[in-house]
Regions:
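Conserved class I S-adenosyl-L-methionine
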Residues: 51-60
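Short conserved loop adjoining the S-adenosyl-L-methionine
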Residues: 110-114
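Conserved SAM-binding loop
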Residues: 89-90
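S-adenosyl-L-methionine
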Residues: 1-49
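C-terminal substrate-binding/active-site "lid" region of AdoMet-derived donor-dependent transferases
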Residues: 128-196
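Conserved SAM-binding strand-loop segment of SAM-dependent methyltransferases
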Residues: 97-106
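Conserved SAM-binding loop of SAM-dependent methyltransferases across substrates and taxa
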Residues: 63-73
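Conserved SAM-binding motif I beta-strand of class I
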Residues: 75-80
């Protein structure tokens, strides 16, 4: 079934949007998928307009990118290392007739951040540290892998131009380079806006 009226989707609550997904994915919403209210604030902070290209680091089933693509005229790319989650995300694109969101099946270490204007980071490597809250059993406990991926992202953030914006969610322990300044906090300090200043 394809939903033609995207304007209606903009007004949906989380339970309505989550209803697009099968139960096996829907049950992870509270922990792993970005709430719509949070997504709207992220898009505002990143000032997403036509021509803005946003990278979602660890996009999962694509809820952030899909809603963002409907809510704004920006271009969204989600990178995800699990092919089955990308297939789910693409199925939602088809249902909602979304043309400005895409998903890349890749390891984050292989992504060139310089191809993007703004970034969203929702604790994408947490499953390497907390298996009990995992989406599936494809990821094994590995603090070393968690550190490797975070270090790769930090290094890539360092190479971006001044005024680059990054929004993090539930990522309070992420060690931003000192070239970035914290500019704002919301949602009990779980949502943070960082801007590269030097």
């Amino acid at each position: 079934m394809q939903i033609q009226d995207q304007q209606k989707v903009i007004d949906w609550k989380d339970h309505e949007f989550d209803g697009l997904y099968d139960e096996e994915y829907r049950r992870h919403s509270l922990i792993h998928w970005t709430p719509i209210e949070v997504t709207k604030k992220v898009l505002e902070w990143l000032n997403v307009t036509r021509g803005t290209h946003v990278l979602d680091i660890g996009s999962g089933i694509g809820k952030f990118c899909s809603f963002g693509a409907i809510y704004t005229d920006g271009q969204f790319t989600g990178v995800e290392n699990r092919l089955d989650l990308i297939e789910v995300a693409n199925s939602i694109n088809k249902k909602l007739n979304i043309k400005n969101a895409e998903y890349v099946h890749s390891n984050i270490t292989e992504i060139d951040f310089r191809n993007y204007d703004a970034f969203y980071y929702y604790n994408p490597f947490c499953e390497y540290l907390s298996i009990s809250d995992s989406i599936d059993d494809s990821i094994s406990y590995s603090p070393e892998k968690h550190r490797e991926y975070e270090d790769s992202v930090i290094e890539k953030f360092q190479d971006l131009p001044i005024n680059t914006k990054v929004v993090t969610y539930c990522s309070e322990k992420f060690a931003f380079p000192d070239t970035y300044e914290l500019k704002d906090l919301l949602f009990k300090d779980k949502l943070a806006l960082w801007i590269k200043t030097k």
